[in-house]
Amino acid sequence: MNLFEQYLEEIATRKKQGLNAKPIDSGDLAREIIAHVKSTNSEHHDQCANFLIFNMLPGTTKAAKEKAEFLKQIINDNYQIDEISIDRAFELLSHMKGGPSIQVLIDLALGQDGENSKKAAEVLKTQVFLYEADTARLISAYRDNNSTAEDIL
């Protein structure tokens, strides 16, 4: 039985006890869920899109890293799914409370896509969970005359 099937069983068991599903923090489970989301033919596509949006823990969990990277792929137009537009992907990143989401937002802000760079910069201006390495990366880009980094700082 794979992790996703185990998660579904756990949800059913918890439901009988009057409990909601546990949040997802496992990177391996997140990858399985994202695989279902990527596959529009998967019978679990819709359910997994919902899990991706609502059940993955934010912050620095392994699931958050997988989610942030997948949202980056959506923003970079590598994947298109009905449930998450580019703007919705930015919104989801904005609520992830630091860690991997900040790295993705900085990648996008300092990237070559002008529109997405501006959107990422606007989200970064609202974030308070930046590590020293994140700030150092922005300062380095600023010193290299990156106008987006200047705008963020």
Feature locations, PLM:
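Amphipathic alpha-helical scaffolding segments comprising HEAT/armadillo-like alpha-solenoid repeats
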Residues: 27-34, 58-77, 98-110, 129-141
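Alpha-helix N-cap/helix-start positions at coil->helix boundaries
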Residues: 42, 79-84, 114-118, 145-149
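Short amphipathic alpha-helical segments that mediate assembly, nucleic-acid/protein binding
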Residues: 4, 29-30, 44-45, 67-68, ...
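Structural detector for internal amphipathic alpha-helices that build alpha-solenoid repeat scaffolds
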Residues: 19-22, 46-61, 83-98, 107, ...
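Amphipathic alpha-helical packing elements
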Residues: 2-39
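Short, contiguous, helix-prone interaction/anchoring segments in small proteins
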Residues: 34-45, 49-52
